[in-house]
Amino acid sequence: MPSPKYKRVVLKLSGEALAGEKGYGIDPEVVNSIAGQIAEIIKEFGIQVAVVVGGGNIWRGLSGSAKGMDRATADYMGMLATVINSLALQDALEKLGIDTRVQTAIEMRQIAEPYIRRRAIRHLEKGRVVIFAAGTGNPYFSTDTTAALRAAEIEAEVILMAKRVDGVYDSDPLKNPNAQKFDELEYIEVLNRGLGVMDSTATSLCMDNNIPLIVFNLEVPGNIKRVILGENIGTIVGGERK
């Protein structure tokens, strides 16, 4: 049996990933499919998986701010949206027999644990999935930054950035059929070229803490397992090129 390349990972899911074709709300079939891919790598390889979910399928803080809403208030609403998504994913995982804990950066003890770093690591060591909800708990910080921050805190080996495209391109492949895909990038290139893989805060945090990032297409079944096994799919973003 092939051996996995990574033991502890942070999986970053956009809120839109849970919405499926509709683009808004939560599609239970899509959530179940994602949960199935996560369960597969845990049952087969014992991978320690932490998840960060966005909230854009329910609410976008930047959109609310652009329409005149107070930015901090709009961002807090977005954080609550991530909690809704996290509970949906927790439910799907537990139906597959995977013990799952949701930890929120804003306390809401009736439905989830507060974020405690040492407890999160202990859960992972016991084979539980930990879903980090409510962003960093602070407005003005994206869920991409949450993924970078939590990856650094729990000493994850890699961030798996699940997208609707199969990697990083020099322009939007959904709009430009001639867009060129990168197999490998340095973080400084991402920043200098404004490639939009993550926002600049998240990118800088990954760069400063030497956390590699793999951008891959979530919509291809089995891709999470392929990434874990080190197959050459997607785009890897890291320090200096080999």
Curated annotation (Swiss-Prot):
Entry GO MF terms: ATP binding; UMP kinase activity
Region (Involved in allosteric activation by GTP): 20-25
BP GO terms, sorted: 'de novo' CTP biosynthetic process; UDP biosynthetic process
Keywords noted in UniProt: Allosteric enzyme, ATP-binding, Cytoplasm, Kinase, Nucleotide-binding, Pyrimidine biosynthesis, Transferase
Main location: cytoplasm
InterPro entries assigned to the protein according to its UniProt record, in alphabetical order: AceGlu_kinase-like_sf, Asp/Glu/Uridylate_kinase, Uridylate_kinase, Uridylate_kinase_bac
Keyword Protein transport among UniProt keywords: no
Family stated for the protein in its record: Belongs to the UMP kinase family.
Name of the protein in question: Uridylate kinase
